[in-house]
């Protein structure tokens, strides 16, 4: 009601309804704001937050595992490459010596037995990638003896 109105006129219902409309509208606006900031969606937010945390945790775990594997793989490569290269040089010397004797059958047999997958097979190495036999690789030692016997003839 306005200050000029004494309430005896027909505008009273309009004023009251206008005030009621404004009050109702304020309540609706308040409810709309409450809906936005209210607790109705907390469960959904908690679930999505938990999903995001789980996803990031899983990705972090995978990244850590991958990094550790790459690191240990690199360390293993760094430690083992010189040993493998040394064995490769010895195999190359054996094959080079054998080919000079003009015995194709002997050369082919040596080439088959001294194949890289045979020479570096895990049965010849321990967990630390050291040769199992004390000093020599069995197959390489065999062919070194063959070459030495050929040279002594």
From Swiss-Prot:
One of its GO terms (biological process) is protein maturation. It is found in: Cytoplasm; Nucleus. The keyword Transmembrane helix does not apply. InterPro entries: Essential_protein_Yae1_N, Yae1-like. Keywords: Cytoplasm, Nucleus. It holds the Pfam family Yae1_N. Belongs to the YAE1 family. This is Protein YAE1. The lineage of its organism: Eukaryota, Fungi, Dikarya, Ascomycota, Saccharomycotina.
């Amino acid at each position: 009601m306005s200050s000029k109105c004494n309430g005896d006129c027909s505008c009273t219902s309009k004023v009251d309804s206008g005030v009621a409309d404004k009050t109702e509208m304020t309540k609706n606006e308040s409810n709309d704001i409450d809906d936005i900031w209210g607790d109705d969606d907390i469960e959904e937010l908690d679930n999505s937050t938990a999903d995001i945390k789980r996803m990031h945790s899983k990705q972090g775990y995978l990244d850590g595992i991958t990094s550790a594997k790459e690191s240990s793989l690199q360390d293993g490569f760094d430690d083992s490459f010189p040993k493998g290269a040394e064995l490769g040089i010895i195999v190359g010397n054996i094959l080079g010596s054998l080919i000079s004797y003009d015995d194709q059958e002997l050369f082919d047999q040596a080439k088959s037995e001294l194949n890289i997958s045979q020479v570096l097979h895990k049965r010849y190495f321990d967990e630390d990638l050291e040769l199992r036999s004390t000093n020599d690789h069995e197959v390489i030692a065999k062919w070194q003896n063959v070459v030495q016997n050929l040279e002594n003839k």
